[in-house]
Each structure stands twice: as C-alpha cells, then as structure tokens.
C-alpha cells in the first residue's frame, strides 16, 4: 500500500515517522525549499512514547512519481485549497483521501473536488509541534488515529491499510461511524479552543478562576446543542471523556490554536468555531459563549492583519 503524506511537520510528520520506522511504504510531499534539508537530516520525532528517526522518501510538486493508494492531508484549514492542488496529480480513480483536519467543513470541499466515494474520514488525537524543519516534538502521551469509511467502496482498502498501520507505534483504529467521531471531536475542539484562546490560558489555569469551569461547561453544552440540532447526537461515552479532559484540575492542556496565537500566526477560527456558529444559526440555536469566543478570534485576526500590513 503506497501512502502519500502532504507535509512533513505536525500530524503528517508524526504519522509518517511512525510508519517509516516500521518500513511502511510512505512518501512525503513537501515544498521544494525543504527537500534538500529533509533528505540530508531526515525526520526526527521526540516522544515519551518512543522516539524515532527516519530517512524518508521525499518528493516535491515538480516530481511525477505516479499515483498512490492513499493520500493523507493534515494541513491547516486555510491551506486546504493549495493542498488539494498539490496532491491532485498523485490521485487516480482508486485513491482514497484521508483528511486529518480539524472540524468537519473540509469534507464538503473534498467531496466536491474528488468525489464522496474517494474521501474517507479521519480523526487525530495528537498534540505536537515542529521545533524546526524535520524535528517534531510530541507534547503528551496521546497518539490516537481513527479512520473510517464514508462510502462502501472504501471499506476494503481501509481494512488493508489497517494491516500495515497497526504495526506502527501509534494507536490506530477503524471506526464504523467516522462522521459522528469527527463531530464529537468538533464539539471538543470548539470548546477547548473557545476557552483557552479567549482566556489565553491552559485548562488548569482557567479552572482556578471563579467562573472558569462554568464557562467551559457552557461552551461544551452550546456545541452539543448544535450537534443535536444537526442530527449528530453526541456519543455519551466520548463526550464524558472529553468533559473530563476539559475539567481536569491542574491540566496544562491548550488548543493548538492558542499556540498559533502566541506565535502571532494565522488561525483556524473560522473553520472551527466560526463553522460551529454557522451550523447553530441555521438551526436557530443561541450561542452566547461561542459568539464571545469567536469575536475574540476575529479581533485577533484583524489586529494581526493590521500589524503585518504596516
């Protein structure tokens, strides 16, 4: 099974490094200016669950290397359009696209571009950062990847994929209801980003405040209301797990969006919290806490744009 991963940092770099360490046929598609450095130094992963180093197969957009059985996307939502054009030459009618993007809005975009029968679903529970090109730091002890079929023709290929990926040092699962899993994480991530970005603090610090836990729980309840109104009844066990993470005293957990804010970088506010609000508005759901969080993120983006344009 030939797998193409777009990018060698973050989720894609972590996944590819784990797969490469057990000799799965994995290729990274990267920018031209990163090819030489990655070919020279390889990809290193530092993790308490086991570190790894590989000399990866690398291609750039100028290479014509044929088609792949699977293409993995884990880009930021605002880079999705360019990501689609980068991987398009490497797809044929049998290729399955596995997106590990945040939220759910990207599914409609990918279905339009490649066809519903070629786009699977994916959920990654992973906190990593790229400290420099080719060096990935795992930030906790969670590395769970879940994929699932959204069309009956994908199921057999995903089962074949499981045979290879289950050998790697990561948690790999096949779901029989992947879109619900994506919605459950959408609820969690919207709550996590809404709380930690608005307060510019970790979950643990927010919980030390007078009304922090109340605010987090209200965010969570608003997101669950949106899911139910869109015929996506949250999975009770999964939401319990998420609620426990969101109310864990002393937790250092933050959303990656907050780390982007701290670096004065572009953020996925519209794709995650903005999309949750849009889906709520269509169903006439009131979302005062989410609206506050989104206003904060929009204000950040406006200030960032003003600073970069002067």
Model-derived features: positions:
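Rossmann-like NAD(P)(H) cofactor-binding subdomain of soluble oxidoreductases
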Residues: 52-135
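Internal alpha-helical scaffold of NAD(P)-dependent oxidoreductase catalytic cores
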Residues: 89-90, 113-118, 133-185, 190-236
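NAD(P)-dependent Rossmann-like dehydrogenase/reductase catalytic/cofactor-binding core
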Residues: 217-310
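Short alpha-helical
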Residues: 33, 78-79, 104-105, 153, ...
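NAD(P)+-binding Rossmann beta1-loop-alpha1 motif at the extreme N-terminus of oxidoreductases
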Residues: 1-51
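Short, well-ordered alpha-helices that flank and scaffold nucleotide-derived cofactor binding pockets
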Residues: 17, 21, 85-89, 112, ...
